[in-house]
Amino acid sequence: MTAATLVTLALSLSLAQHDAAPAPVAAPVEQHGQAPEAAPDAHGSPAGEPGAAVEAHAAAAEHGEAAGHEGGHDESLGAVMLHHVTDGYVIEHPGLCHGGLAWNCEWDLRETFGDSLKFGKLDMTPTKHVVMMWLASALLLVVVLGAVRKKSLVPRGLYNFIELLVAFVRNEIAVKNMGEKDADRFTPYLVTAFFFILFLNLFGLLPFSATATANLSVTVAMALFTFVITQYAAIRAMGMGGYLAHLTGGVPKSLAPLWLIMIPVEFLGLFTKPFALTVRLFANMLAGHFVILALLGLIFALGTPWVAFGSVPMALSIFLLELFVAFVQAYIFTMLSSLFIGAGLVHHGDDHGHAEEHGHAGPAAGSEHGSHVAGASPGHG
């Protein structure tokens, strides 16, 4: 039996149960010789009027919505998936609640902070993704300070792994994209971005946690940091005049009318880089969680436990893949940030390279010419 058939049968059963609901009791037939009249409904509207059915459906919908709010969350598959990937003010955790030890306790951040962080229309109340970023920042400080205070010449265990990652970011990412001279200036930012994104990605795989990097606002903020540092590096390397001249796309002054086309194109190109960083990290982290939730949701959508024998192993394999993706996405964001920063430095380096090349060409040519003359003298002699 195919999945489509199972879904069709489930829908048919639910519709049949809905149609089999007891109908309202009809008004009594003629009594004492009077003509039958429709009994008034609960809202005081005669049942024979067309508006009665509309009012009844509206009241039922209102009652269902209120019950949904009182009962907690919508239990549909789509609502559950969105609940686990979107941001909010409620953090679920195990603990003592509901009269005992429970797994579905809730910490409402709005009740904790109240109106203390509201300034007019600006609401600074932290959400669960903000809490995850606080935890990632605290863990980053603990790991870095612990690695710095380690006095042994040969670090072991976790600190050996941390030192390996730091050396990898510097030598394989920063140095190769910026050069030895400029790498040390921007390595602290690249290392911070790498570990911060890595911790946020790993937090999203823990129970009762949330994936902050699957929030578009978080990835936009991270990309803006890279954007600002990239523009700072370019202006520092080329100067404001060289930076503005670079927006012409290398078109000479003799073709100045083409600047009307090149300057807008180059200006928009400045923002395509942070846009790529934003969408790449956001989409990759969001997609993995959606796939896991969809595979597990098949058990409840199809209404049979036998689906678990296929969906659970598949979800577990995707979960293990997400562990790898957590490192890969942190690496890609750091690599692209290094490339974009290095792109602002390369023009400055090229100018120096050409100057040095032309500066050394004269003496080299002179010495080469002198050697030819010296070598030819004995022959002529």
UniProtKB/Swiss-Prot annotation:
The record, for InterPro entries, names: ATP_synth_F0_asu (IPR000568), ATP_synth_F0_asu_AS (IPR023011), ATP_synth_F0_asu_bact/mt (IPR045083), F0_ATP_A_sf (IPR035908)
* Comp. bias intervals (Low complexity): 47-59
Annotated Pfam families: ATP-synt_A (PF00119)
Tell me which UniProt keywords the record has, alphabetically: ATP synthesis, Cell inner membrane, Cell membrane, CF(0), Hydrogen ion transport, Ion transport, Membrane, Transmembrane, Transmembrane helix, Transport
Which terms in the Gene Ontology molecular function aspect does this entry carry? proton-transporting ATP synthase activity, rotational mechanism
Per the record, the domain of life is: Bacteria
Spans annotated as Disordered: 24-73, 351-381
Cellular compartment(s): Cell inner membrane
GO CC, alphabetical:
plasma membrane; proton-transporting ATP synthase complex
Bilayer topology reads: Multi-pass membrane protein
- What is the protein's quaternary organization? F-type ATPases have 2 components, CF(1) - the catalytic core - and CF(0) - the membrane proton channel. CF(1) has five subunits: alpha(3), beta(3), gamma(1), delta(1), epsilon(1). CF(0) has three main subunits: a(1), b(2) and c(9-12). The alpha and beta chains form an alternating ring which encloses part of the gamma chain. CF(1) is attached to CF(0) by a central stalk formed by the gamma and epsilon chains, while a peripheral stalk is formed by the delta and b chains.
Function of the protein: Key component of the proton channel; it plays a direct role in the translocation of protons across the membrane.
Q: How is this protein named in the record? A: ATP synthase subunit a
Source species, please? Anaeromyxobacter dehalogenans (strain 2CP-C)
- Its encoding gene is what? atpB
